[in-house]
Amino acid sequence: MSDVVLELPSDLRHELKEPLGRIYTDTAALLADAGDPIIAVGDMVTYHLIEAGRTPDLALVDERTERSAVDADVAAAIDGFDRTLSVDNPAATLTADLLAALRDGLDSDETTLLDVDGEEDLATLPAVLAAPAGASVVYGQPDEGMVLADCDDTARDRVRSLLERMDGDAERAIALVSN
């Protein structure tokens, strides 16, 4: 059984629809504006970055997009990482394993693919909190494009507020991703 640290309450879901940054439909334009390192959350975002010639420093994938399996060619293209870590993370949750693996991936000098059994969507929040200054977290905004979230104080404050309003132990979640 997964060690769930935080769970998304239904009354908070609407706030997650508001993007944490600018929305892009052009990968090259996004990459021109992105900081370093780049953390990708989602299969399609990871695929588009790789296809544009930029393997993310850390990518979190679950082999699904908008609740359907990704195409075989997309899954096959998500390759070329120095290492792969696998974790369980049920939908609408953040588990201790996912949070610890996120921190591990950020601390590594190797590109890391975090293969999530379950759902990786909420990982955007702790990724913004945990990433170093100047980093960018890229994630998908359904039917709109890719969001480029800068890891600055404004974004971190918003993310911390969201995590603190989730059900569970926000202090533990924040501690697991802090360095």
Swiss-Prot record:
Binding site for GTP: D43, V45, D62, E120, D143
Catalytic activity: 3'-dephospho-CoA + GTP = GDP + CoA + H(+)
Pathway: Cofactor biosynthesis; coenzyme A biosynthesis
Enzyme class: transferase
GO MF term set: GTP binding; kinase activity
EC number: 2.7.1.237
Pfam family, one: DUF359
UniProt similarity note: Belongs to the GTP-dependent DPCK family.
Biological role: Catalyzes the GTP-dependent phosphorylation of the 3'-hydroxyl group of dephosphocoenzyme A to form coenzyme A (CoA).
Identification of the protein by name: GTP-dependent dephospho-CoA kinase
Protein's organism: Haloarcula marismortui (strain ATCC 43049 / DSM 3752 / JCM 8966 / VKM B-1809)
